[in-house]
Amino acid sequence: MVESQKAMPQPKMGRIRRIHFVGIGGVGMCGIAEVLLNLGYEVSGSDLKASPVTERLESFGAEIFVGHRAENAATADVLVVSSAINPANPEVATALERRIPVVPRAEMLAELMRYRHGVAVAGTHGKTTTTSLLASVFAAGGLDPTFVIGGRLTAAGTNAQLGTSRYLIAEADESDASFLHLQPMVAVVTNIDADHMATYEGDFNKLKKTFVEFLHNLPFYGLAVMCLDDPVVREILPQVKRPTVTYGFSEEADIRAINVRQQGMQTHFTVLRRDREPLEVSVNMPGNHNVLNALATIAIATDEGITDEAIVQGLSGFQGVGRRFQVYGELPVEGGSVMLVDDYGHHPTEVAAVIKAVRGGWPSRRLVIVYQPHRYSRTRDLYDDFVQVLGDANVLLLMEVYPAGEEPIPGADSRQLCHSIRQRGKLDPIYIERGAELAPLVKPLLRAGDILLCQGAGDVGGLAPQLMKSPLFAGAKQEKSK
């Protein structure tokens, strides 16, 4: 039985009243800004362009500047920046000149977490979905958590919310090692994979050691929740000197799933926990990777005393996260329609998991993928993996690499990827010129019953809504909210 969790008043940050975010529209920044607005702070922020995110923050009282200029930061008591912000940014330069503190976003998140019962979700893949599932289950258990998520939680219509309880659930970002700022009570490690390796000087051992260091930020009475199915997590487990709970499909796991059945968008499975009755669970997401995300959630909810009824309710009622296998609707084609799906996956492991989920849930349907690689460096470092995984589509269209501020790297572009995939002999990918309209290219390739997946972390994210509105797909049916 969960005890009533009274909200703990957030102590004020000394003389800080006005907080300025450089790049406030970013997915990692806007959520923290929204929570701070709800706590009563004055919030301002700048970004290169206005967006629905900045408009939402403006409606809550934030002052938004389009473009980066020195005067934007002139009245701030502190600047919050992400790792994407150049140190030469005029607002940052002005703050440093005026001795205004400049802090990374993770340090501000850590400040919000300092006086709360923090639950931090780390791992190369699955952070956003696991964090979102936790928010849903905690809410179903009556705990009303504060949450900061790297994606839009469909049920809440936002990626952040100030709750009334002492719980704060957030993603822990390893991409720039900033998760070391966090000192949670509970930490999850979903998996550890080679990504963002420039942060770790190309040394995978350094990445592993940093995850261990993150887990040792837990107090001695905290809890590390670790996926035993991931070989790297299993490898570092003996080094973790904190209480641990393991989860996975492995028979050795403390909390494990058996009897997994996938039916389209729904996945059903049985959960086995030590010294407890089996639990029958359903989630509205396809794929074994989402079963693992649900198991991490169940492990924490069980430890926090949330009832089985609330766990089942929170998982079955979960409505998903924006761009995580988000079904937009049906596009009309000759003889029927095509299911249009949008997904954020931008690492070969994530692409493979989604392809496997599609094959499991819709085994008789063709999979047409429009994919945009994210960063030249990632494309270079994981090139062979991309070639192998993307070659498993039935039809593949490749957009040019989304640079994310990087300069092109010879041999790490989408034309070269097309060439390498073609050489495997399984399919003939189509290269999409930068700026080309997608609808006329993709429509002739589609057949009734296909699944059309738009995938990647760049501007490919705008394609699904564009296709829904395209005159070439007049009569497209929008997916109804659950």
UniProtKB/Swiss-Prot annotation:
Gene3D superfamilies: Mur ligase, C-terminal domain, Mur-like, catalytic domain, NAD(P)-binding Rossmann-like Domain. ATP binds at residues 123-129. Its EC number is 6.3.2.8. It catalyses: UDP-N-acetyl-alpha-D-muramate + L-alanine + ATP = UDP-N-acetyl-alpha-D-muramoyl-L-alanine + ADP + phosphate + H(+). InterPro entries: Mur-like_cat_sf, Mur_ligase_C, Mur_ligase_C_dom_sf, Mur_ligase_cen, Mur_ligase_N, MurCDEF_pg_biosynth, UDP-N-AcMur_Ala_ligase_MurC. GO terms for biological process: cell division; cell wall organization; peptidoglycan biosynthetic process; regulation of cell shape. The keyword Cell inner membrane does not apply. One of its GO terms (cellular component) is cytoplasm. Pathway: Cell wall biogenesis; peptidoglycan biosynthesis. The keyword Cytoplasm applies. Keywords: ATP-binding, Cell cycle, Cell division, Cell shape, Cell wall biogenesis/degradation, Cytoplasm, Ligase, Nucleotide-binding, Peptidoglycan synthesis. It is an enzyme of class 6 (ligase). It is found in: Cytoplasm. Its main location: cytoplasm. One of its GO terms (molecular function) is UDP-N-acetylmuramate-L-alanine ligase activity. Belongs to the MurCDEF family. Cell wall formation. This is UDP-N-acetylmuramate--L-alanine ligase. It comes from Pseudomonas putida (strain ATCC 47054 / DSM 6125 / CFBP 8728 / NCIMB 11950 / KT2440). The lineage of its organism: Bacteria, Pseudomonadati, Pseudomonadota, Gammaproteobacteria, Pseudomonadales.
